[in-house]
Amino acid sequence: IRNYRCEFTRDELDYLATAPEITVTCDPSNAPIEGYNENTQTASGIAADVLDLVSQYTGLHFRYIKSDSFSDALSKLRSHEINMLTALAHDYSWAEQNHALLTTPYLNSSIVVVRNSKPQSHERDIVALPNSFNLTNSILDNPEYDTEDVVYYDTIEECFQAVLSGSADCTYADNYSANYLLSQVKYRNLSSTTLTAMTEAASFGLSDQCDPRLLSIINKGLACISSEQLDSIVLQNCSYREDPSLLTLVYAYPRISIAIILAVSMTLLSLLLGILLIHSRKTK
């Protein structure tokens, strides 16, 4: 039995015939995997684009609900306020803790450790980790990593800012989020190293109170997405577009920028002094 590009059973078609709108939420600040666009009031990023294709291929309709943070989004999933979370680590134990069902993964990533190129003076590593992330649990549970001193932040970017400012020595992130942030000029002093022994896959997380047919239908929609389509989505979302500004130029070219600012300041000062001198002569 065919519907769109997917093969559905009669039972699944019966569900689709009367399927309710699926409520979805996301981490609002985890680009490029997921985010929330305030202008359009909808989700953005790799996960949202993948879900758009799932909608095309299955006929399912999704409505996004804003969350303030990943912790808030996860809380909404746990309490069954929403039907789906756009990115949940593909870990069945983690899913069970959060009363969730996992789709097949749509994205696989390696994990990197991010450090400041300027060494810090701490006696031992202070590690910045994001709240409520499965990755945080994986790092803490692994004896290979030094996590005696941990500081928690709400977002991955806040962890990067902590490392940049020297409040922390390192942080951990998936390679997509890390590369997206490291492409920004302000993080030019940070560098990443891939952890060969650790990877993480992202799935859609469904409330465990959802109809089991919904999970099957979404998985079939994901199976219809080609590797070329997924590659295109990833490439479109992973290129950070930095708006040109004076601050950006100062970050990118600090020495030249300081020289230009000093030259402009001296010129303006000379003009001001000249105007004052002319004015004082006229008043005599």
Model-derived features: positions:
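Acidic, polar ligand-binding/catalytic clefts
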Residues: 48, 52, 56, 61-123, ...
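Extracytoplasmic/periplasmic, Sec-exported soluble proteins
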Residues: 42-46, 65-69, 105, 127-131, ...
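Alpha-helical transmembrane signal-anchor helices
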Residues: 246-284
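Inter-domain helical "communication" segments and dimerization helices
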Residues: 6-8, 98, 118-119, 141-145, ...
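Extracytoplasmic small-molecule ligand-binding "clamshell" domains
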Residues: 3-96, 142, 149-153, 158-161, ...
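A "functional boundary" signal
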Residues: 122-125, 142-144, 159-167, 186
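Sec-exported extracytoplasmic/periplasmic mature domains
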Residues: 55-60, 78, 82, 144, ...
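Extended ligand-binding regions for polar small-molecule ligands
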Residues: 1-15, 48-57, 117-136, 140-141, ...
